Structure formats: C-alpha cells, structure tokens
UniProtKB/Swiss-Prot annotation:
One matching Pfam family: ABC1
Name of protein: Atypical kinase COQ8A, mitochondrial
Transit peptide: 1-162
UniProt-listed CDD domains: ABC1_ADCK3
Taxonomic placement: Eukaryota, Metazoa, Chordata, Craniata, Vertebrata
UniProt source species: Bos taurus (Bovine)
Amino acids binding ATP: S340, K358, T445, E446, L447, V448, N493, D507
Length: 648
C-alpha cells in the first residue's frame, strides 16, 4: 500500500508540474508574464503542498517510511541562477529569495544594454568554478529534499523547513558545505560597480623558464607561417577591393584575422613584455589597424590568462610571508582582472575596507630581454613591422619601460605622488596605497567602483564631454606643470564612477618624468602648430632632433603636415568634434611617406608621450566628445611661461 501511495504522490506531482509548464508556455506565447506567472506558480506550489499533506497523513497511518517532498517549487531555479530566463528573473527572485538579498549576478550581465557590461553587482560572490554561477550559502542543493511527513511547517502558504532522513536540519551538510557558508557570510558586501574578468580568460600556468617561453614563441612563428600561406592563397582567389580603405598593417599577410587570434592566444598565455606590446596594438585606431583586428587585439587588455591557485599563492607567500592572510578578513582566490604584468584580486582588510591586490606573474621581470628578442624575431620574420620604425631603438625604449613597470615598489611611490598632486581635484582621484600589503611583486590599493571608459559610450553627451575635457586638461598638466606623466592610456586605467561622478586613475607603473630641456621645446612646437606656423614648427623640430635638416622635401612636408594636423584641435575657439574629425585619416595618409624617408628615430621621450597623448585623443574620439580646446592649451601655455619666468 505504501509503495502505491508513493507512486500516486509522484504521479500527481508530475501532472501538476506538467500543467504548470503548459500554462506558462501558453502565457508567454500570448505575451503575458510577470505577476500572472507568479500567480500560476503560487497555485501550483499550494496544490503540491496540499497533495503532500493529504498523502502524508495517510502515509503516517500506514508506515513510518518517508517519501519525497519538495520544499520549493524549483530548487534548481532558486539556487542555480545561471540558467534562469531574463524575463522571469524578477518573479523567481521574489519567490526564492528574501527582500534583503542583493541583486543576483545576471542583473548586470554582459548582454544588457548601456554601460552595464563593464561592471557587475557582485554581492553574492562567485565560488571558485564556473564564472557567472552563484552558489547557495548552504552548499550544494539537490533537486529534491527529504521532508518529515509530520512537518509542522508544511501547512499551505508557509515555506517548510527542510529536514533530512535523520530528522536533522544539518544532517546532510558536509564540513565543506558548512565552511562555504561561513565564508559566504564573511564575504564583503561589494560596491555596486565592479570590474569583471573577461570570459575569454583561462587559468593557465605562467611559463617561467626561458625554454618554456621560447617554445610558445616558436609555436607562434610556425602558426603564423601557415596562416600567412592561407591568407595569400585566399587573397589570390579573392582580390581586395581597391576602393576600400586600408590600415597601415593591412599589407602584411601575416596579420590576418586568423593570425591575430594566434598572436592573442600566445600573448595571453606568456604575458609579460609580449602582452604589453599587444596592448599597445589594442588601443590604436582604424588608421593603424583595421577594426576586425582591433577587436581581436582588444581582448589582450582584460583577458590575459590567470595563474593557477598554487602558483599565485607561492608568489604571495614568498613576497609577503606565510602569514599574510592574517591581515585580511577575506581574500577572493579568483582574480577579477588579468593584464600583462600581473593579475588583480579582491580582498577585505580586518577593518572592513575593500582592497585590490595586484600580484605579479612569476618570471616576468627576468624574462623581459628574452621575450622582447623572441617577439622581435617573430615580427621580423613575418615582415609585420613597416620600414622606418627603427625597431632596435623602439625595443630598447620598451625594455627600459617594462623593467620599471615590473617594480611594484616604484609604482606605489608614483601612485602616492600622483595622489598628492591631485588630492584636491574635483573630478579625479587616485586610490590609496595599502603599505602593509605591498612588496616588489605585490601592490595593494583601495578598491574603486565604476567601469572603464571604453564602456562609457552610453553616457549622456554632457558627461562624456566633461570626462574627455578633464582628461585632456590633465594630460597637459602632467606634461607642462607636473612634468610627471602616467604614460599608459589603456582605457581600463580610467574608471568612471557614476555615483560619485568621478574618474579613478589606476596603474602608475608606466609613469615617467620629463626634463625642462624637453618640455621647453615641445610646448613651443605645440604652440606653433596651434598657430599653424610651419616655419616655427620646422625650426623647433630640428632643435628637438625630430629632423636632421637634410630630409627630402617630401619627408619634411609630411612631418610638418602631421604636426599641424595634430594642432588643429588647439587652433580654434569653436567646439572641436572628436567624433567626426578626420585627424587620424589625414595622418594615416602621411605615415607611409614618413616611414620611407625618415633619417633618424624620434626623441626617446616621444614614444611614451605620444602614446599617452594619442590615447587621450582616441578616448575623446571613441566617446564622440565635442568641446573647444584652444582655451585649455592657452591656459597651459601661459602658466608654463609664468613658472619659467619665476624660476629664472
């Protein structure tokens, strides 16, 4: 009899669920959802409970044996958020969670519109495992839970407490489950906007030895060779459209989309100096690299692979000592960002303050020279570098810059200096350094909220204008007032917080100083360009050793035209429209001439300076900013001349 009753229970419950599914499908087909679906589910849940009560009472008279009963309508839907439909999210949350709970991870998922993809509401922090899945604070929850037939909480309309077969509410929890619940309670309540690791990032050990890193570059070289052959064959069968616009690097068959994928995969794996070069490619405009390739290279900014837990812990123990966790209340073992030199983890200090811990990849500092040499071998073999770039000079500069970036103690000092310089600024702020958790390979700062500027396109025109205006003013102040500049224009180094309406400045590893001897001449070149004075630009360019004075006329004209084009933004009192300007296209047409006829490499300072200034203009272009620039430069120029006079 008991077996028959059990079968009847299962049959009736199955019929009720089938009816619910059919009704929901029909309602969704008719475009009805929300409260109506909630009502249907509530009726189904009540019906299930009534059936359980009736058969439970009969069962209690027949036998003490227990049968299945469900405490929730859909336990998987309540505890396994990643598979839920967006349109029913509000109904499911209201049914399965208390009102005090923070929004689930999908509330700001990458698929939503506007700037939301850049950050996530991360209150229920993810367990180590599949990104985007939220874990129950009680550990793993099965699709069915055992319940007592005489459960006093099983009355209709009341949510029943779940019991196991041993009549204990804790009987089925393992030590691991209890520990997870304890950690979940200790986790910090995160800020409303938090950076998330790219879905392309994978956990892979950083190749530390020189041979291990060389093997990756060797595999890349072979792959590029086969990819180039395939690209040549494809182009021979389908000639390019002669009317189409080409970027500077489009002429190389080695830089096809397939090869770009190969390069990005290798760079994200080896990280370090090689990935840094890839990040430089990721912030170029259409004139230098076509949009399809730029989109591929864009992944290297936030989708570098991250270290396995064991390798990461070894770095922390070696640098901070074995008891470094004693200073923390919580530490997130999965990073929320991974870049060229290191990866960033969320943590919380004992006092409750949330911090970001940047941990350097092992072997990166020691492998700079070999990485650069290996990468240059691949690039030279594939003929990717146009003539006239003076790669030897460029690589020497890159080596020195990377060596400085690998010194986290130097970066901490630069961040403190910038924080002091901008302490009273109404729009920018620099996160505070946490000295007790800093070392040559670990850098800890306070956690900032917001999203990077490449995700700010959905903001209003007024806010975008204000952001870009302040960035250009800061760029001029760094060069001509501080003479101390953060030269990495990666969009992820500028985080906009819509709640504070401020931009946080991050990553000061690429910070450098500029001598007065350089800035005295450079500001005169910019001034002459703003005034469209070709003779003054030529004179100062020779003084700065941009030119020797012996260049052919074509090279001289191309150089002067390029500088005058760059000065156009500072030449007019009318608002300059960065979104529709043709500056990059005009310069793009001059690059082949300059690469062909250049006699000397540009001054060393200009590599990092032009990277920063060009990146700042690209931010303005991407955000389609529109504002007058002449007054900002005139103010910078007059202030510079005043300080110059005071110091004489």
């Amino acid at each position: 009899m008991a077996a028959m009753l059990g079968d009847a229970i299962m049959l009736i419950k199955g019929f009720v669920k089938l009816t619910q599914a059919a009704v929901e499908t029909h309602l969704q087909h008719l475009g009805l959802s929300g409260e109506l679906l909630m009502a249907v589910r509530a009726l189904q849940s009540t019906a299930t409970e009534q059936v359980g009560m009736v058969f439970g009472q009969v069962q209690g008279q027949e036998t003490p044996e227990e049968y299945y009963s469900e405490s929730l309508d859909d336990p998987e839907g309540a505890f396994h958020f990643s598979g839920m439909r967006a349109e029913s999210a509000s109904a499911d949350v209201s049914a399965a969670s208390s009102p005090e709970q923070s929004p689930p991870p999908w509330a700001h998922a990458a698929g939503s519109e506007g700037p939301a993809p850049a950050y996530v509401a991360s209150a229920p922090f993810r367990e180590g495992g599949v990104l985007g899945q939220a874990a129950s604070p009680l550990g793993r929850v099965n699709g069915r839970l055992f319940a007592s037939p005489r459960d006093p909480f099983s009355a209709p309309g009341l949510q029943r407490r779940v019991y196991h077969q041993d009549q204990s509410s804790m009987g089925g929890l393992t030590a691991e489950d209890i520990e997870k619940a304890r950690q979940a309670k200790a986790r910090p309540e995160s800020k409303p906007h938090k950076q998330a690791l790219s879905e392309h990032a994978r956990e892979r050990k950083v190749p530390v030895t020189r041979i291990g890193r060389l093997a990756n570059f060797g595999g890349l070289a072979v792959g590029l060779g086969f990819g180039a052959l395939a690209e040549v064959a494809k182009k021979s069968l389908r000639p390019d459209d002669p009317s189409g616009k080409k970027a500077v690097l489009d002429s190389s068959p080695f830089l096809s989309e397939a090869n770009a994928e190969r390069i990005v995969r290798t760079l994200c794996k080896v990280r370090g100096a090689a990935l840094k070069l890839g990040q430089m490619l990721s912030i170029q405009d259409d004139a230098f690299i076509n949009p399809h390739l730029a989109k591929i290279f864009d992944r290297v900014r936030q989708s570098a692979d991250f270290m396995p837990l064991k390798q990461m812990m070894k770095t922390l123990n070696n640098d901070l000592g074995p008891n470094w966790r004693d200073k923390l209340e919580y530490f997130e073992e999965r990073p929320f960002a991974a870049a060229s030199i290191g990866q960033v983890h969320l943590a919380r200090l004992k006092g409750g303050r949330e911090v970001a811990m940047k941990i350097q990849y092992p072997g990166v500092a020691q492998s700079i020279n070999s990485d650069v040499n290996n990468l240059m071998t691949v690039l030279n073999m594939s003929n990717m570098l146009p003539e006239g770039l003076f790669p030897e000079h460029l690589i020497d500069v890159l080596r020195r810059e990377l060596a400085l970036e690998c010194d986290y103690q130097r970066e901490a000092a630069c961040a403190r200096r910038f924080r002091e310089l901008l302490k009273d600024h109404p729009f920018f702020y620099v996160p505070e350094i946490v000295d007790e958790l800093c070392s040559p390979h670990v850098l800890t700062t306070e956690l900032v909220s917001g999203f990077p500027l490449d995700q700010a396109e959905g903001l209003s025109q007024e806010i975008r204008n204000e952001i870009c205006y302040n960035i250009l003013v800061l760029c001029l102040r760094e060069l001509f007032e501080f003479q101390f500049m953060q030269t990495d224009p990666n969009w992820s180094n500028f985080f906009y917080d819509p709640e504070l309406h401020k931009v946080a400045l991050l990553d000061f590893g690429a910070t450098r100083e500029f001598d007065r001897s350089f800035t005295d001449l450079y500001i005169q070149i910019i001034r002459a360009a703003a005034n469209q004075d070709r003779e003054a630009v030529l004179k100062k360019s020779i003084e700065m050793k941009f030119l020797t004075g012996y260049e052919v006329k074509a090279m001289e004209d191309a150089h002067l035209d390029a500088i005058l084009i760059l000065g156009e933004a500072f030449a007019s009192e009318e608002p300059f429209d960065f979104g529709t300007q043709s500056t990059t296209e005009k310069i793009h047409n001059l690059i082949p001439i300059m690469l062909k006829h250049r006699l000397v490499p540009p001054p060393e300072e200009t590599y990092s300076l032009h990277r920063k200034m060009g990146g700042s203009f690209l931010i303005c272009s991407k955000l389609k900013a529109r504002f007058p620039c002449k007054a900002m430069f005139e103010e910078a120029y007059s202030n510079y001349c005043r300080r110059q006079a005071e110091q004489q």
